[in-house]
Amino acid sequence: IRLHKTNFKPYSKKKILKKIKLETKNSKLSINDGFEKMNKLVKLSKILVFTYPSTGFLEAIRSNVPCLMLWKNFDLEIDISAKKNFENLRKHEIIFTSEKKLSKKVNKIWNKIDLWWYEKNIQRNLRKFKNKYCNGKINLNKIYREINKIA
């Protein structure tokens, strides 16, 4: 699980990991504090879990790497022009606004992540999303700023 490198106070990495392991009953999870290179994490991971909207999430989608995202302030932060496309990822349980629902999803798919990720309906919806946000030569930082209403 990759945390934002500056945005998880007052909890330490250790406290967050303990809480997640208790809720998921999965001792194999690990926490990344946001400083490690993404390509190294991808090689070591069954699934990537993002705790905030980021270019890393878009890169994972673009590369077709199994991933989930927790976006607690989705309804407040999402730009109206992008909402429909991101709502579709929420509908297909790739984006979550609740830690508890995200945790349940991880538990449900843990032993069959590839089966879930490569299911036709999931891949079809990911393709639609990629065609809109992750196609060809793109500036992922620019897209991220547009989606999140950042000037």
Task: Give the positions of each predicted feature.
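Residues at the C-termini of beta-strands that transition into short coil/loop
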Residues: L3-K5, D33-F35, W71, T97-K100
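Short, well-ordered alpha-helical microsegments
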Residues: K9, K13, M38, G56-L58
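C-terminal alpha-helical cap of glycosyltransferases
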Residues: N131-A151
